[in-house]
Amino acid sequence: RRDDGRRISSRVSSLAAFWPSLLLLAGSDVGEAQMTFRGYWEIFRRFGALPELFDLDSETAVHFGKDAPLRPELAESALHLYLRTNDGHYLVVGRELINALNDDSRVACGFAAVADVESKRLDDRMDSYFFAETLKYLFLLFDLSLEPQDRQSFFCCDETSIDRLNSTRGCAVDGRPCLSLSATLLSTEGHFFQMPSGRVSGAFGARMPLDAVAGPFECEASTTTTEKH
């Protein structure tokens, strides 16, 4: 909106659904992030998908923006809101996102983008960010909601690097997951960046107290083997 309260545009882009997570990372009030997320979630529930463009005045998907190409932004914001609030509502959100993917987008070779959110016609495409980001955020949302011993963290830190685990369960140290979101940043493309405790930015520290940021965790080596049947 403009300073006088008037709308700059009546159209809402699905790409902007990352905004609630950015507000939280910047240390903004959680209520503002929740309110913004609620608007996107209402649009999603109307169609069972988030169209690329939605018009607030007509309350319809814009005719050239009716597609929903499996974007990650809504799942990203749900993850950050859950981490901040521990509100089970965001787990329900994650469940509905997964159900929609399975009900509407699952095909023999993977998952297809929705070409039209009204007819649920599918497109012949599955962008790489679906695996790199969308599924990653959904995995973390539910993995971090579990008790530490039940988590399946797929990265584990030692003193010098981040290595893949052989174990399907992952490992935890002192009740903390190996992939600590208090010491790890996820880029807009879902890439992991390990943050040294002495270089945590002010914005990051506003979200997570500096004394909560630990150094890299050491995990015991895994010797799990898989039997073939």
Regions found by a protein language model. Name each.
Residues 1-229:
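Glycan-recognition and catalytic cores of secretory/periplasmic carbohydrate-active enzymes
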